[in-house]
Amino acid sequence: MVKVYAPASSANMSVGFDVLGAAVTPVDGALLGDVVTVEAAETFSLNNLGRFADKLPSEPRENIVYQCWERFCQELGKQIPVAMALEKNMPIGSGLGSSACSVVAALMAMNEHCGKPLNDTRLLALMGELEGRISGSIHYDNVAPCFLGGMQLMIEENDIISQQVPGFDEWLWVLAYPGIKVSTAEARAILPAQYRRQDCIAHGRHLAGFIHACYSRQPELAAKLMKDVIAEPYRERLLPGFRQARQAVAEIGAVASGISGSGPTLFALCDKPDTAQRVADWLGKNYLQNQEGFVHICRLDTAGARVLEN
């Protein structure tokens, strides 16, 4: 039996729409991500478990884990009879890479089960393809950090899909999921087809400056450059209370904040544990909208997807 855990991820990070993403893990040791188990069987089966299993499609063929198995078999040119189990711990449409968690865990578990016939680059390409079936287009800003860990910059040149960018150990990521759903497709549809020149220039300056600040080890500058002129001005209308929450966490002491992925999760970066706790407390009281919401204080997950059992 192979059991694989794939961590949550925060895509875009305000400054890098579709080209930056970070894998995250709670500081309290909780597993914030999906788990997929694969074991040999006479025929294929899929069992859904976990807190958010009831949110998955009732038709098995619509389940992305089934589609991962089907695509993996196609890639190898043979049917692979296995019993799969998806432990769905991630809320769907949360902005935390929920579909990426399932895709990464499923494909990595299948690859491990079969003796690693696919290398990481090919596996990541498949992950992007499968995740794109849910989000509506292929982009790697969730699957790459989820699979490889850390903060990843999408390259997509010279057969390189992404490369790691050095993060800052002192940064704590406070992630607040309010408990409502925002579909990636809906969040993309709300964006304009064209942007003003000054916005394009500002976006390029922010992103280039952020990457430079990461490599030159300037955390204050990096945090200051985490600004979003591409998506946030349009998407914030989908997120009740987002603008007030951003203002509040800044007043408490967060060094940066924004929309995680396409929302509705809000991320706030803090450089001190006590600030992170106060931000988390405020968000827990004021940003969550129902019992399904949660707040986690996280660090970068540098390990990425990993085998828990084999």
UniProtKB/Swiss-Prot annotation:
Catalysed reaction, written as an equation: L-homoserine + ATP = O-phospho-L-homoserine + ADP + H(+)
UniProt binding sites for ATP: 91-101
Record's subcellular location: Cytoplasm
UniProt KW Isomerase keyword: no
Enzyme Commission designation: 2.7.1.39
Gene Ontology biological process terms in this record: threonine biosynthetic process
InterPro entries: GHMP_kinase_C_dom, GHMP_kinase_C_sf, GHMP_kinase_N_dom, GHMP_knse_ATP-bd_CS, Homoserine_kinase, Ribosomal_Su5_D2-typ_SF, Ribsml_uS5_D2-typ_fold_subgr
A Pfam family matched in the record: GHMP_kinases_C
Protein keywords: Amino-acid biosynthesis, ATP-binding, Cytoplasm, Kinase, Nucleotide-binding, Threonine biosynthesis, Transferase
Pathway: Amino-acid biosynthesis; L-threonine biosynthesis; L-threonine from L-aspartate: step 4/5
Primary location recorded for the protein, binned into one broad class: cytoplasm
GO molecular-function terms, A-Z: ATP binding; homoserine kinase activity
GO CC list: cytoplasm
UniProt cross-references to NCBIfam families, sorted A to Z: PRK01212.1-4, thrB
Functional note: Catalyzes the ATP-dependent phosphorylation of L-homoserine to L-homoserine phosphate.
UniProt-listed PANTHER family: HOMOSERINE KINASE, HOMOSERINE/4-DIPHOSPHOCYTIDYL-2-C-METHYL-D-ERYTHRITOL KINASE
Similarity comment: family membership: Belongs to the GHMP kinase family. Homoserine kinase subfamily.
Official protein name in the record: Homoserine kinase
